[in-house]
């Protein structure tokens, strides 16, 4: 095969920036001209765009995706004595947020094909939890790698148990479940605008989506130090968590490009599938789901060998995530489902994420797939 058509990037922010650089420069210059760097007009404009994109009644931006999780849990008065169910196979923020509030993360296993929370494991965890004296309050439904979880099955279970659903859409913003956009699922949804996310800014940022009037009012107060109707009358303990105006201005322009980029990501994923699906375990989408394709992740019994081969050919790859949360030093003290988290543990040994972005060239995908297949 010929040489790579370009240096392979795991995530190519430069290619995107080149497409809209003039628009970004103008948007940033406008903020510099008006000088409202905190909660300027672009923040409200971007929140309006997010509401339109998701169909949520409210969209409230904040400083980052982790704060978004914390703000929702704070609005729901989650704290000591409360159990928050979290998949063991995910990024730490999903468990960090409840733990910081004094609640107990309760770890649940995931489905092998989707990497998302397993409703059967969740049902067992709720039963286990009730025996401990903890109060089951919330399930954090993480949409890992871009695909929404089985929200209907989880919703049926959660409703029957009186448990709220917090969708962690940090990786799935732009995806859909049965035609419903991420942002309109669960009691509340959060997302992250970290630069590497499908919709990312050039710093940190996050957002919360809800259709509950009361939750929206409380979250708006919490993100601004717990302020009341008067600026210096703080009616609750809050935090300082705001999306700055420059990032909002950037995100307004990037959101305009986002639908096209989602389509390009889906095309790139389909090309990978056509090259690899007969050779190894590729990502499987649930029926009537679309993915934001934050990552393209294989399950490979000899993962380390293949990653080494890719590295030797200057092809980047990443393991998301090498240690289940329930096994990590800071979190193994917390309870996990009695049936165990065996799928999470095995996936941590076998997953490998390949380069994925909207501007990935087919020639490079062919070379990457060839390296994977030759080293199986």
Where are these regions (language model features)?
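N-terminal "arm"/small-domain region of PLP-dependent enzymes with the aminotransferase-like
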Residues: 1-36, 41
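Active-site phosphate-binding strand-loop segment of PLP-dependent enzymes
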Residues: 113-201, 207-209, 353
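PLP-dependent aminotransferase class I/II
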Residues: 2-3, 14, 26, 43-48, ...
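Pyridoxal 5′-phosphate
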Residues: 19, 78, 136, 265
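Structured binding elements
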Residues: 102
């Amino acid at each position: 095969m010929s040489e790579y058509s370009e240096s392979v990037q795991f995530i190519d922010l430069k290619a995107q920036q080149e497409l809209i650089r003039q628009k970004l420069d103008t948007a940033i210059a406008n903020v510099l001209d008006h000088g409202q760097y905190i909660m300027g007009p672009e923040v409200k404009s971007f929140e309006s765009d997010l509401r339109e994109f998701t169909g949520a009644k409210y969209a409230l931006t904040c400083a980052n995706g982790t704060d978004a999780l914390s703000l929702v849990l704070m609005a729901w008065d989650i704290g000591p004595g409360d159990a928050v169910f979290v998949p063991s196979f995910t990024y730490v923020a999903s468990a960090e947020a409840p733990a910081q509030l004094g609640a107990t993360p309760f770890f649940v296993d995931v489905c092998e094909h989707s990497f998302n929370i397993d409703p059967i494991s969740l049902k067992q965890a709720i039963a286990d939890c009730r025996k401990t004296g903890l109060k089951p309050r919330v399930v954090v439904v993480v949409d890992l790698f871009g695909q929404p979880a089985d929200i209907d099955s989880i919703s049926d279970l959660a409703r029957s148990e009186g448990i709220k659903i917090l969708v962690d859409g940090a990786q799935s913003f732009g995806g859909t479940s049965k035609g419903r956009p991420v942002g309109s699922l669960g009691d509340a949804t959060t997302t992250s605008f970290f630069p590497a996310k499908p919709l990312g800014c050039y710093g940190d940022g996050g957002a919360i989506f809800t259709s509950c009037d009361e939750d929206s009012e409380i979250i708006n107060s919490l993100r601004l130090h717990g302020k009341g109707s008067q600026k210096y009358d703080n009616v609750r303990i809050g935090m300082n968590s705001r999306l700055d105006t420059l990032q909002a201005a950037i995100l307004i322009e990037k959101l305009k490009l986002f639908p096209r980029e989602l389509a390009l990501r889906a095309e790139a994923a389909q090309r990978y599938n056509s090259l690899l699906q007969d050779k190894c375990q590729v990502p499987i989408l649930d029926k009537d789901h679309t993915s934001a394709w934050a990552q393209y992740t294989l399950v490979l019994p000899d993962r380390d060998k293949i990653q080494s081969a890719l590295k030797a050919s200057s092809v980047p790859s990443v393991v998301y995530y090498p240690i289940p949360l329930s096994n990590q030093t800071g979190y193994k003290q917390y309870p996990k489902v009695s049936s165990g988290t065996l799928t999470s543990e095995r996936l941590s040994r076998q997953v490998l994420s390949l380069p994925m972005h909207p501007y990935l060239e087919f020639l490079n995908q062919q070379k990457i797939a060839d390296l994977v297949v030759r080293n199986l």
